[in-house]
Amino acid sequence: MPRPKDLVKGWLGPVTYLLAVLATGQITGDSLLRALVVLAAVELLVYPARYQWNDVRGFVADQHHPASHQRGRLPGPIDKARARVAASGAAAVAKLLVTALLIVLLPGLNLFAPLAFAVSGIFGVAVVYEVLRSTSTGKSDAIPERVRPGVLALWLVVGGGYVVRGMLGVALAVDLTTRPAVAIAAAIALWCYGIAFVTSRWSIEALAFATVLDGRLTWKAGAGQAREHLLTLVRWLPPGTCGSKVDEWAPLRGRTPFGAPWNSAIIAAGAAAALTGRLLSGACPVRQGIIIALLGGVAAVALVWTARREITLLAMGSVIIGAMAMASAPRPVAAALPWLLLMSAYLFFTTRTIRKLDRGSPVGAWAGQLGERVGRLALGTATWQAVRSRGPRSAERQQWAISQPPN
């Protein structure tokens, strides 16, 4: 199963498929069935296999994370590394074999092309990510670290996975071989959105290494924890406005610098998303496309700059819809939806706190409750309680992060 905290990412493929269908006004039963099978295979088989590989590579560093018991990663202790890694690796391979088996068992759905794209894209991005992570982290305990080229490259690469997820949805609804402009605009929008989402989340996760001293944040992390890609981001966080409880602070709720990766990326995503919506709705002259893209970017700037983001989103969304109507888009509201959804997502992830990330989404909570019931039934209450035994509580995790010496 996917990680509960990552379930929100799984909506990207279905949402982009639905957006493309709404914008084009075209759908068939075969298209819907094919999309359901492909997207389910990607989220339930391919991505979990990729995350297991990530957990295997980060096994040792994860054991030293202050929230290791609550992160849902490969469990320790370190002296069980061989057994844990072998079991996780075998499970990952099995999931990929089941994915290949679907292609053979369901030939009428023509699954080879989308699933081959998914596997090659997901693991291609993963290889680059893991190489960059291993060569760019674990070198320094300075906080905030200066923006090194390797860390910057890591921030850029993380958007690639969102391109794979999102473009799968678009490609299952639209023949992108005949509409290359749609493919390019959508890929840029998804890539930039992925960068914004991940870097904003990493900046919040970095607060696990912080404590409050005299109303200001102080940081402590060892180089061996390999978290430079998180901790470099803290340079763009407000310095001392979190009160006394770090885990309840939403540092991105107010204004943060335009140069922060999540802000720069969401502005670019806004421009590309507005253009994508217009292109999906029908033929678009080049000049009109440039104007729509500029309008989407300016509207995103307004959203980043203001402290009253909900009202600004409604106002700018109305402007985008009006512009689509003036541009004679056949379905102006549907054409504006890519921009509206990306900006709504920005509003959501800028309100996150450590506590909210730990709590996860309602869908994740429901999935966790279902898994708990199944686990208790399969293992018995006593064994299940032993398996689910918790580590240190939040306050203890904060103290751990402060007191541990650098590795």
Question: How would you name each of these model-derived features?
Answer:
Residues M1-F59, Q63, R82-L96, G169-L172, ...:
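Topogenic membrane-insertion module of multi-pass membrane proteins
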Residues V21-I27, L106, L132-S136:
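Structural signal for the C-terminal ends of transmembrane alpha-helices
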Residues H65-A116, P251-G270:
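Multi-pass membrane catalytic core of lipid/isoprenoid biosynthesis enzymes
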Residues F59-Q70, F209-R216:
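Interhelical loop segments of eukaryotic multi-pass membrane proteins
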Residues R84-R133, L279-A299, L303-R308:
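Transmembrane helix-loop-helix
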Residues Q63-R82, V131-P149:
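Short, flexible helix-coil linker/hinge segments at the edges of structured domains or between repeats
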Residues S31-Y47, N110-I122, L176-R201:
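Alpha-helical transmembrane segments
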Residues R3, L7, Y129-N407:
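C-terminal membrane-associated helical module and adjoining short loops/tails
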